[in-house]
């Protein structure tokens, strides 16, 4: 459960992404594919070279979905219902991949916003991403 302080930290962090959601999301995906090559199996039709338009486009979708979730912290299941259905029933993404991407997102944010990435912000973002992952995997059962 996200506390009031967690919610403030999450919203502030996503607002700081500004006009760069595709860049941050794409970089996080790139980190995931390099660190965990088995995650590439879901993207066989993509150009997975660093900085490719496919990575940026999908990275923007990921970042936009997280921004939407950050705007609906009191109703994550409602905000992410369509994505949960998509990932569980159509794409059949292995649930562990959400944790891997969450880790890569945290690393990317820490690398680009070191002054803002305090231990409290890190903890809040980790809780947020864990909550998002839980919602996205809820329809697997």
Curated annotation (Swiss-Prot):
Residues bearing PTM N6-acetyllysine: 16
GO molecular function: haptoglobin binding; heme binding; iron ion binding; organic acid binding; oxygen binding; oxygen carrier activity; peroxidase activity
Residues bearing the modification Phosphothreonine: 8, 108, 134, 137
Sites bearing N6-succinyllysine, chain numbering: 7, 11, 16, 40
Expression across tissues: Red blood cells.
Binding site for heme b: 87
Coiled-coil region(s): none
Domain Globin: 1-141
InterPro entries noted in UniProt: Globin (IPR000971), Globin-like_sf (IPR009050), Globin/Proto (IPR012292), Hemoglobin_a-typ (IPR002338), Hemoglobin_oxygen_transport (IPR050056), Hemoglobin_pi (IPR002339)
GO CC annotation, single: hemoglobin complex
Function: Involved in oxygen transport from the lung to the various peripheral tissues.
Subunit-level organization: Heterotetramer of two alpha chains and two beta chains.
Protein name as catalogued: Hemoglobin subunit alpha
